[in-house]
Design a protein with these regions (language model features):
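Alpha-helical segment proximal to the catalytic Tyr-Lys
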Residues: 60, 105-109, 169
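Catalytic loop of short-chain dehydrogenase/reductase
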Residues: 70-95, 100-109, 122
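A glycine/serine/threonine-rich, flexible loop-to-helix segment
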Residues: 26, 30, 83-85, 109, ...
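Substrate-binding pocket helix/loop in short-chain dehydrogenase/reductase
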Residues: 28-44, 141
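Short, small/polar-rich loop/turn modules that mediate ligand/substrate recognition or access, typified
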Residues: 12, 108, 113, 171-173
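Short C-terminal tail/terminal secondary-structure segment
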Residues: 24, 160-161, 172-185
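A short, exposed helix-loop element centered on a Lys and neighboring polar residues
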Residues: 55-56, 101
Length: 185
């Protein structure tokens, strides 16, 4: 609550929360047990528990403003996209999807809408190493994407604005895919 209070003092009433934090590590699941467990705990802690913790911290201001929560999920909330060694990331993003839907059901009675965006391959620092070191994986992904390209961070802006605005006043518990059509085929 102290964080929410501090933010409220700086920016005024909080009515929109975007949970956009995530990490991934590509260590082999079959590798060193201690490293695998550490990676699992770190990824789940940031990607899933972080969404829970921040949302919980801002719950009262969001209820007071009948606010909107936009969680950043992933294409991997739905499918495994042939990226190696990603069970923790995939699991964390499945969790964000489940959390989004469950929270939408629970907070709807307070007028709070909870939705998510499911980005496909977006050119961000999170996947820079994969893009640089595994062009064959990027090609497989892009070849499966009807728009034929990776997304840019600005490709997420439109869905985020829509979900945070009154244009989506009757939308809750939904996932807006921003994946270039990856899931369409």
């Amino acid at each position: 609550m102290a964080v929410a209070r501090s933010v409220g003092e700086r920016v005024g009433r909080v009515s929109i929360l975007v949970n956009n934090a995530g990490i991934n590590r590509r260590n082999a699941f079959t590798g060193d047990a201690a490293a695998v467990i550490k990676d699992w705990e770190d990824i789940i802690s940031i990607n899933l528990n972080g969404v829970f913790n921040v949302t919980h911290a801002f719950l009262e201001p969001l209820r007071a403003t009948k606010g909107r929560i936009v969680n950043i999920a992933s294409i991997q909330s739905f499918v495994h996209v042939r990226t190696p060694n990603s069970p923790a990331y995939t699991t964390s993003k499945h969790g964000v999807l489940g959390f989004t839907r469950a929270l939408a059901a629970e907070l709807g009675k307070f007028g709070v809408r909870v939705n998510a965006i499911g980005p496909g391959l977006i050119e961000t620092p999170l996947n820079a190493a994969v893009r640089a070191n595994s062009p064959e994986l990027v090609k497989i992904f892009i070849d499966h994407t009807p728009l034929g390209r990776a997304g840019k961070p600005e490709d997420i802006v439109g869905p985020a604005i829509f979900l945070a605005s009154d244009l989506s006043a009757y939308v809750t518990g939904s996932i807006v895919m921003a994946d270039g059509g990856y899931r369409a085929i």
